[in-house]
């Protein structure tokens, strides 16, 4: 969405938080850390990966940091889609998926939601395409149970299923516990929404 230059607005359309980050975040940004700003940061983000791996119960090499989850998603589309390999996604979801497909000349397979705005998992079975599912789907406020995502993974063993969990902390089941069981699963999370760090531009892509 549009970014006002005066920053006097709280952008509800992108869910900017009116609250400060956790006191633990403020405490972590000590004078010692501020002094490090004159130096280039670790290009592999080893400390971040170690902390994230401990939090999510994964190995550091299963996590890729990004400049916000948008970058993680963009890279995923670059890696798993092209003019011969479409991206399948719902007709009512984040607009960025269609924008990126247009920029990268990726064919879009747009799948309609049901009349009640829920997603029918069977519409995604056996597509032989890369799939991205926002879960929860913020534009509709509806989330799929983890078991239904698992059904989509089983039905597409040779194709990547990307689960965009930008709003998972607001409700819904994370698919992170499925990562070690499915090589075709990529889970993407952001620190910009419930974690109140939009200005830090930090996202994580997690997979097997």
Residue ranges of predicted features:
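PLP-dependent aminotransferase-like
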Residues: 79-134
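Hydrophobic/aromatic beta-strand patches that form the interior of the parallel beta-sheet core
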Residues: 10, 88, 109-111, 162, ...
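N-terminal "arm"/small-domain region of PLP-dependent enzymes with the aminotransferase-like
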Residues: 1-39, 51, 126-127
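Active-site pre-lysine segment of PLP-dependent enzymes
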Residues: 118-127, 139-161, 165-197
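Phosphate-binding glycine-rich loop
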Residues: 37, 47-86, 104
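Short glycine-rich anion-binding loops that position phosphate/pyrophosphate groups of nucleotides
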Residues: 15-18, 69-70, 94, 135-139, ...
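Short, well-ordered alpha-helices that flank and scaffold nucleotide-derived cofactor binding pockets
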Residues: 27, 31, 54, 78, ...
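Short beta-strand-to-turn element immediately C-terminal to the catalytic PLP-Schiff-base lysine
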Residues: 203-208
